[in-house]
């Protein structure tokens, strides 16, 4: 019997363990009986683990240096109407007094 290829990384080196298929290359586990769930939905969590969504308001929880500027974003700065994007800095927003910015979700908390 031939084992199925990994649905995540397409590796041929998979093995079966207790009814689950496991890929040693990407550590993906799946059951052939249930359909593979692929979600295009972007999941972003704040510093406290709360799910963030487009349009949310957040507060900065740490003083952040702004690259290319001598000023800083102070703790407690409120940011309204965020937009979630792919990438390392996964929050796109406009901050009063600074203009457009990209922030990391680990430095904000949901209001």
Curated annotation (Swiss-Prot):
GO cellular component terms attached to this protein's record: cytosol
Disruption-associated phenotype: No effect on phosphonate metabolism in B strains.
NCBIfam families, per database record: phnA
Similarity annotation: Belongs to the YjdM family.
Protein name per the record: Protein YjdM
Organism: Escherichia coli (strain K12)
Gene coding for it: yjdM
């Amino acid at each position: 019997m031939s084992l199925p290829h990994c649905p995540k990384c397409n590796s041929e080196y998979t093995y079966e363990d207790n009814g689950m298929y496991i890929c040693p290359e990407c550590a993906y586990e799946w059951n052939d009986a249930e359909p593979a769930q692929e979600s295009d939905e972007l999941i972003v969590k704040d510093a406290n683990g709360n799910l963030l969504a487009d349009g949310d308001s957040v507060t900065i929880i740490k003083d952040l240096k702004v690259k290319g500027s001598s000023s800083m974003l102070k703790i407690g700065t409120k940011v309204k109407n965020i937009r979630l994007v792919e990438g390392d800095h996964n929050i796109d927003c406009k901050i009063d007094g600074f203009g457009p910015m990209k922030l990391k979700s680990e430095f904000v908390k949901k209001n």
